[in-house]
Amino acid sequence: MSSRRFLVCFYTSNINMATKLFERLSNDYLKLLDDKEDFNVIISTGESSKIFQVHSNVLRYRSLYFHNELAKASKDENNHKKINLNHISTQQFEIIIKYIYGGVILIEDQDASFIFELMLVACEFLLEELVKYLETQLIETNSSWLRLRFSHIYKTSFQNNQLQDLQKWCNDIVAKYPDKLFESEDFISFPENALISLIKRDDLQMEEKKIWDYVIKWGIAQNPGLSSDPTSWTNENFLALKATLKTVCLLFAFFK
């Protein structure tokens, strides 16, 4: 996988022509990242708490996450704001911070597992462009890896609404091979939005009665107090299941 850099880009308007020289700009900002003279933010990452000395203006305008964190971060005796990211590996953050400063993505030597975890970190930092890029890399060049871990990938993608492309990729597969999802051990732990996204599709290759059986199974699992035998249920038990499946039931009525 080759690294990505923003190169020279041209556009023409009705009035004039402008030339955008991004590569030099990118290189200059990467030099700024290495410049330790004017930093005003200290970020610690990884188990070893490696320190990154960075600049608040760059972080604030490149990432909504850092914009919010900087607003509440306290200053030390040297007037530096401190942010603790010890749950993020140093290797991951080195890639993230180079993207934030220079718009470069250096992942050519990384495997699919690392790229997937990096994508989740990019989601945390609300870096939409980077998330989209990493999604594309996984789907286009690591689809076999995704398929081998399909249940985990599916569940994770629907736990984060930023992963729209990955959600669609997963649902396209489930529409053709529904047992891949419905027969998985993790099915009952899937989020409601995943179930809803499938019911909304008109190309799901499964009979409605069978889909409904799985929906009931999922609904029961969301209520730990419910027995798997409906004949033993009280009126309160039925009401609890009805409340759990309220949104899903409305979709069945609408798409029927």
PLM features: what roles do these ranges have?
Residues 2-60, 87-113, 196-197, 201, ...:
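N-terminal BTB/POZ boundary and linker segment
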Residues 27, 65, 78-80:
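Residue-level signal for pocket-adjacent positions within structured domains
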Residues 27-31, 68-73, 160, 185:
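Intrinsically disordered, low-complexity boundary segments flanking structured domains
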Residues 36, 76-78, 241-245:
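A generic structural signal for short, non-catalytic loop/turn and secondary-structure boundary residues
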Residues 52, 63, 224-225:
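Intrinsically disordered, low-complexity acidic/polar segments
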Residues 57-71:
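Short active-site loop/helix that positions an aromatic residue
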Residues 73-86, 119:
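Short, conserved non-catalytic motifs in the polymerase core
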Residues 95, 101-214, 218-255:
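Post-BTB helical module
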